[in-house]
Amino acid sequence: MGNKLTNISTNLKSSWLTAKSGLNRTGQSLAKAGQSLKTGAKKIILYIPKDYQYDTDKGNGLQDLVKAAEELGIEVQKEESNDIAKAQTSLGTIHNVLGLTERGIVLSAPQLDKLLQKTKVGQAIGSTENITKGFSNAKTVLSGIQSILGSVLAGMDLDEALQNNSNELTLAKAGLELTNSLIENIANSVKTLDAFGDQINQLGSKLQNVKGLSSLGEKLKGLSGFDKTSLGLDIVSGLLSGATAALVLADKNASTSRKVGAGFELANQVVGNITKAVSSYILAQRVAAGLSSTGPVAALIASTVSLAISPLSFAGIADKFNHAKSLESYAERFKKLGYDGDNLLAEYQRGTGTIDASVTAINTALAAIAGGVSAAAAGSVVASPIALLVSGITGVISTILQYSKQAMFEHVANKIHNKIVEWEKNNPGKNYFENGYDARYLANLQDNMKFLLNLNKELQAERVIAITQQQWDNNIGDLAGISRLGEKVLSGKAYVDAFEEGQHLKADKLVQLDSAKGIIDVSNTGEAKTQHILFRTPLLTPGTEKRERVQTGKYEYITKLHINRVDSWKITDGAASSTFDLTNVVQRIGIELDNAGNVTKTKETKIIAKLGEGDDNVFVGSGTTEIDGGEGYDRVHYSRGNYGALTIDATKETEQGSYTVNRFVESGKALHEVTSTHTALVGNREEKIEYRHSNNQHHAGYYTKDTLKAVEEIIGTSHNDIFKGSKFNDAFNGGDGVDTIDGNDGNDRLFGGKGDDIIDGGNGDDFIDGGKGNDLLHGGKGDDIFVHRQGDGNDSITESEGNDKLSFSDSNLKDLTFEKVNHHLVITNTKQEKVTIQNWFREAEFAKTIQNYVATRDDKIEEIIGQNGERITSKQVDELIEKGNGKIAQSELTKVVDNYQLLKYSRDASNSLDKLISSASAFTSSNDSRNVLASPTSMLDPSLSSIQFARAA
């Protein structure tokens, strides 16, 4: 017997070395454990409280335990109860035979002694014969416990687990619970101390060198010496064998339907075999006890088992495999473009799906077995130990599986991590996730190449510069979070392409786009005389990103985004006549948002544009813009976007073409750059990654100011704009809305656009076109020209001084109706739209009614001209109105038109007038079909929701 125990002891010590290697490392103690327990190796300690008094009448089991522990190398320690209690309480492992403390694994002598003092065991100990065997039995019991622990905790670094309170610590606790449950159930089932020690030792021997649950079941099969009627370890063995069988779901080539089927097959097989064994045993016990064993009892067992199997558990797993399949399909294209990240995601989904399927199948089986055994044992006193055993063991196994699942998930994630790191090692200087954005961009470029090649024709530009911002990609974000590499990922990347004569050019030699420094340089125009700079997607603000991954909880991490911002984009143009649409350049940054996502605090990125030579057009965006038009005829448009009404006051400007434009953007939605959080899950681990992107966010309104220099024309917004001109020659277009335009001094060109506008030419020879709507027009001093078209509405003109003209540019003079209404001359076109020239007859009537009245004003327009250059003078109007008793007869008007001498004279004047009208051809509003600057009409694939185009002028 001594040799046998020596061999067992040697084997047990060997099996414990794996766990002990981790236990022997020192480290920082848990704060909760107290300074008194700060040092000491991690080991097994037989703990005996100083004040513990064992019952000598029931044997000397405690003394035998102490002797056996000393021989087996187990430290025996008597401690103050308060110190151990602190450590046990801090880790939540009290009231069991085994406990986990900061100092190591505690084997509680009082708890073990209680087991040895159970009635049926204690009676055996009380005999003289059994007392002489006490030492051997105690040694056998302790060595068996050592062996079990050596397997349950194999490979665990308890020192690190205790310090970090990691997932492994929880798993270690669950392992101890399993060991406690086995010991308790064996103690409750055997009849003698010999049997208790023998069975503990057998179980420990069987578990030597077992690594994990996958082979635990096989080791338990055929375990001899266990009374089926008392312990039922064949049932436990079957349960663990079922856990092993479930791993067949790991076949990577199996289809989703096959995996789901395998899960059901496993559950049914385990349920069938185990429940059959349990049920037959329980029913036999019921018969022996004189209890019912009829059909209804068997039906109760079957129904309880069937309720425990839920197809919904497997449906969720099937979705995971379907996701992996769709990712693999999606990944094919990008793999050809040099990026395999989507395949890595699919690999992760399949790997974790397999784990989920395995654990779900096992837990389903365990739940079914526990339910079946409980139903079968109902009312059977004899069967209760079996029901308790199965219920306890299945619960502990489920706990171990759930906590093991996290480690398995991390194993799959680590493989993904290593592949990304290896790729970057083999591609020095490259970023794996940036490579993903490159592939996304190339695919987008391929999809839209036909459209892009047609842009030269559509935008009427010899060269088109297309700038594309690839924004945050959820798949790339998932991959970064899963692989714990969120610090390497970017919020996106900007790209530039050039197109000439329907050909795609390499833009890196033609255009400088530096998102880090905020530079856009398109000055290298070569031979191209016209170019259009198109921002296909919203361009994020300039600057560089840095990320920092920090732990916020046991399984929670966040990768914080830090942005080194540049306060402006600097745009440089060259000699070509260029068009810039800046409405897709993000200038507003949402610094703070409320719970509803509304922007409450903002920051702005300025745009500074130097246009150089050429006749340029700039469509201003949502923020402060500084424009130096340089040479050429340059126009600044506010007609795209919805960025508030203009207030322009150039009355104090000392340089022609200089303007300060104030805007107030009323509350509503506008393009903002905001920071959001992407969440990726790896089992219990939650990875949050901050990133920035553009979005139309609701805001409370804001002011912005633009500075314009060397600008020849300004086109207003759809709001109610105010224009106050300079002492120089100004060109204003009100756009939509009810606009107020004052040309001030200079020879101004003023266009109202849509809406009921008020336009005053001021001093100088002004060109005034009210546009659509019922406008109030005033020429002021100077030789002014007014224009009215069919569909423009009812206009009212007040004129004073100068040689003025009114052109009905699309009406024949003879089709108009002239009549006197009160003091005014009213001219009506064929659409019954009226142009009223205020106070035309007032001075003449005053002269008739007031003696010696001297006229002080000239409120008449000296010439009224039709579309073919035919005209009637103010003198002719007065004569024919008087002749027609307040209205010019059509016959008289026809005579005027047919007067060849007048027509000949009018041709020369008409040519001059046509030049004036054509010079205003750039005046346009967002809904005016006349002279609209070209913008793309085609659209990208609707699925690419982030892609936007230049809005219609």
Curated annotation (Swiss-Prot):
Where located?
Secreted; Host cell membrane
Q: State the family it belongs to.
A: Belongs to the RTX prokaryotic toxin (TC 1.C.11) family.
GO aspect biological process, one term: killing of cells of another organism
Gene Ontology cellular-component terms for this entry are: extracellular region; host cell plasma membrane; membrane
UniProt cross-references to Gene3D superfamilies, sorted A to Z: Serralysin-like metalloprotease, C-terminal
Q: Any idea what this protein is called?
A: Leukotoxin
Main location per the UniProt record: secreted
After translation, the protein is modified as follows: Acylated by LktC. The toxin only becomes active when modified.
Where the Hemolysin-type calcium-binding repeats fall, as residue ranges, is 715-732, 733-750, 751-768, 769-786, 789-806
Q: What else does the entry mention about this protein?
A: The lktCABD operon has a complex mosaic structure that has been derived by extensive inter- and intraspecies horizontal DNA transfer and intragenic recombination events.
The transmembrane residues are 230-250, 297-317, 359-379, 381-401
Q: What is known of its domains?
A: The transmembrane domains are believed to be involved in pore formation in target cells.
Which keywords does this Swiss-Prot/TrEMBL entry list?
Calcium, Cytolysis, Hemolysis, Host cell membrane, Host membrane, Lipoprotein, Membrane, Repeat, Secreted, Toxin, Transmembrane, Transmembrane helix, Virulence
The protein's topology relative to the membrane is: Multi-pass membrane protein
Native source species? Mannheimia haemolytica
This chain's function reads: Pasteurella leukotoxins are exotoxins that attack host leukocytes and especially polymorphonuclear cells, by causing cell rupture. The leukotoxin binds to the host LFA-1 integrin and induces a signaling cascade leading to many biological effects, including tyrosine phosphorylation of the CD18 tail, elevation of the intracellular Ca(2+) and lysis of the host cell. This leukotoxin is a major contributor to the pathogenesis of lung injury in ovine pneumonic pasteurellosis. It also has weak hemolytic activity.
MF terms in GO: calcium ion binding; channel activity; toxin activity
Q: Which SUPFAM superfamilies does its entry note? A: beta-Roll
